[in-house]
Amino acid sequence: MRSRHFSVVAFVLTSLLAWAAPASAEWSELVKEDEATYYFDKEAVMPVHVSRFAWVLTDLPKAEKTPTGENYKSMMLRVRMYCKNDTVVRLSVSYFDKQMGKGKEVSSDDVHEWRPREYPIRPNTYLAALKKEVCGGSKAASG
């Protein structure tokens, strides 16, 4: 019984540490625009077959509203990027009251669909810049 309890506690702590990792990430700038600056965590990119999991941080110059009405100044987005077919899936998003993913998490949303919707990666966007960084050339995209 004691070892089972320890296993559950260890699993929960490991899960929390994995979720907290992006908060202490080394963010690399992707794109800077008037309305937002986009970053990604190079160290957290995880290749799985022909796709890549990545964290994206969006920093805003002034507060905006979440879909539920809370003010936020930054958001962290977890995505799965499909390198071969130029699509991306949003897995989760967290909104923060301060820039660079700091301060209080004011809202979050995780995709709970069995098959999340894929969106096309449009040229000249932060997602196109992310694809270039995480998928690289044809060798990275094919393996």
Stretches found by the model and what they are:
Residues 1-10:
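Bacterial N-terminal signal peptides that target proteins for export
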Residues 9-18:
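Bacterial N-terminal signal peptides
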Residues 21-77, 82-143:
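N-terminal secretory-pathway/extracellular module detecting exported/lumenal segments
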